[in-house]
Amino acid sequence: MDASSGVKHPGTFDGLKEKIPYLKGLGVNAVELMPVFEFDEMRDARLIDENLLLDFWGYNPVSFFAPNTSYSSSKEYNREGMELKSLIKELHDQNMEVILDVVFNHTAEGNEFGPSFSFKGFDNQIYYMLTPDGHYYNFSGCGNTLNCNHPVVQNMILDCLRYWVIEYRVDGFRFDLASILGRNEDGTPLHQPPLLRSLAFDSILGNVKLIAEAWDAGGLYQVGSFPSWKRWAEWNGRYRDDMRRFLKGDDFLSQ
């Protein structure tokens, strides 16, 4: 976080909590946090002017059930969870909802040349979509694709989301590359994906917001046709891009 933020704990949950009055003054009523699951910060890390720049975007998840340790201001073991809970409580006290950006389309283990520290070791064939010759389908653009509609993986995702709702009191989720959550084990799009249906009708998740980034890196684009059961909202990427180009004046769209 840039020093101009003026916060005591930049780049942390506590640092964001310091800016809540500013958000309140803007009239903000909901905050969407980029991925806060524990993720691989060293992927794509680089040295620039002798400064080590880490990957802080969060889109290389390592553990779906744990908040990222580096977002703790104290850097003490197990403090990150308490600090995130404190942030969410303060946002709620100021009448702001909290949406988590969640990444269930892939993990930081990458393809067959990537590291092995979780699902590859548990059961590679269950947790990942594999081609007939044992390579990884890459509908995520990140090396592997989580096999979301296998019963084991589906239950893990449901348990994870319930955990974040019950334990952290989050108000909703934005699903990165959500179209992957509707593919079967060989990547074929399903008409009624078991995972998406289960999410739509789950008793614990019934009152939380479900927001789909309704496309993936495999070319599947489902804006306007995402399986929703009247429960899912959708990001409209093309509208977003058109509005950005218009506001910037690209291609003379503002003339």
Provide a role label for each language-model segment:
Residues M1-V170, R174-F201, L220:
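Substrate-binding/active-site clefts of carbohydrate-active enzymes
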Residues R169, G182-D186, L190-Q255:
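Conserved alpha/beta catalytic core and glycan-binding cleft of carbohydrate-active enzymes
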